[in-house]
Regions:
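Active-site pocket-lining segment
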Residues: 108, 170-239
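Flexible glycine-/small-residue-enriched beta->alpha junction loops
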Residues: 19, 25-73
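Internal helix-turn-beta structural module
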Residues: 196, 218-223, 227-232, 237-281
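Condensing-enzyme catalytic core mediating Claisen C-C bond formation in acyl metabolism
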Residues: 126-188, 192-196, 253, 260-265, ...
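N-terminal extracellular/periplasmic Venus flytrap/periplasmic-binding protein-like
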Residues: 84-166, 223, 228-230
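Active-site-proximal alpha-helical scaffold in enzymes
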Residues: 1-31, 75-104, 150, 154-160, ...
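Short acidic, glycine/serine/threonine-rich loops at helix termini
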Residues: 36-42, 180-181, 243, 277-283
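Active-site nucleophile and cofactor-binding loops and adjacent substrate-binding regions
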Residues: 1-6, 61-63, 143-148, 208-210, ...
Length: 285
């Protein structure tokens, strides 16, 4: 169960199939219908049931924290306060609102009476953030991404398409880290994937970091030495929601469109419960 990493991991599995000669074209991505999530319960020996919302992600109960608690622990570990988290959330919403027209080409329009854009982003203010209810410590409803429904897919091909600025999936890294601080996992994944392809952060032109929590993005920027001005330039999950299985693929779709437009080298990275992390590099040929 790759949880939040699954959308990016699907791309790497598709790339592996093509590299092994098992396929010429692969459609890879993810779908999440959080609004239709099943009712989950453990059946006890006496026949009774105990409901639960978060599944177990490690065999050690004392190393399997609630994700909000893990985010708050990450904030303490990284020295990131609530004001910094709120500021990142405010910027995410502002960038998403400013980019609605820019992102229109990324969204497949489904005529079922719903908005043809990400409808959640809004003018978020410091005052609203201050009033937001705390979930755990410095982690609040304002600096945490809401659960969402979405789907995102990429088409991977063995041969480069005969188009201007074809985008190449260089490759990626999936790693395991401390399950108590899963937000640190993308840092190691970023460092390893850059090392594998003999690149450094100065070579990156576009960066998409999953922001299930504001502190997650801030910790990745801080830990991996990323330029914050390059990260989530059109807003992120804080402004649009976190459709778990689709979130990683959404990062890749964003990079694809930006790289097709301007060229360069793009990085996408995401963390998942259990201490998982995946980082992927794309570039224009």
């Amino acid at each position: 169960d790759r949880q939040c990493c699954s959308g990016l991991d699907a791309l790497l599995l598709g790339q592996a199939l093509i590299s092994a000669g098992q396929a010429d074209v692969v459609i890879a991505g993810g779908v999440e219908s959080y609004s239709r999530r099943p009712y989950r319960a453990h059946r006890n020996p006496d026949g009774s049931q105990t409901t639960y919302d978060q599944a177990s992600f490690t065999p050690w109960p004392n190393r399997d924290p609630n994700m909000a608690k893990a985010a708050n622990d990450l904030a303490h570990y990284s020295g990131i306060d609530r004001q910094q988290q709120d500021s990142w959330a405010i910027d995410s919403h502002a960038k998403a609102l400013a980019s609605r027209m820019h992102l229109a080409s990324e969204i497949c329009q489904i005529d079922i009476g719903l908005p043809q854009h990400d409808a959640y982003s809004r003018p978020l203010s410091a005052r609203l953030c201050t009033r937001a209810k705390a979930i755990y410590g410095s982690v609040t409803h304002a600096n945490t991404a809401v659960a969402a429904d979405a789907a995102a897919f990429c088409v991977l091909t063995a041969a480069s398409p005969a188009t201007k600025r074809a985008v190449q999936l260089l490759g990626g890294i999936s790693i395991g880290g401390d399950p108590c601080l899963p937000g640190l996992a993308p840092i190691a994944a970023i460092e390893q994937v850059l090392d594998r392809y003999q690149l450094n952060t100065a070579k990156l032109t576009h960066i998409e970091i999953m922001e299930a929590f504001a502190v997650q993005a801030l910790a990745s920027i801080q830990g991996a030495g990323l330029d914050p001005d390059l990260v989530n330039r059109h807003g992120g999950a804080l402004a649009r929601g976190h459709p778990i299985a689709a979130s990683g693929a959404i990062l890749a779709v964003r990079l694809f469109h930006d790289l097709r437009s301007t060229g360069g080298i793009g990085l996408a990275a995401i963390a998942a419960a259990g201490g998982l992390g995946t980082a992927v590099l794309l570039r224009t040929e």
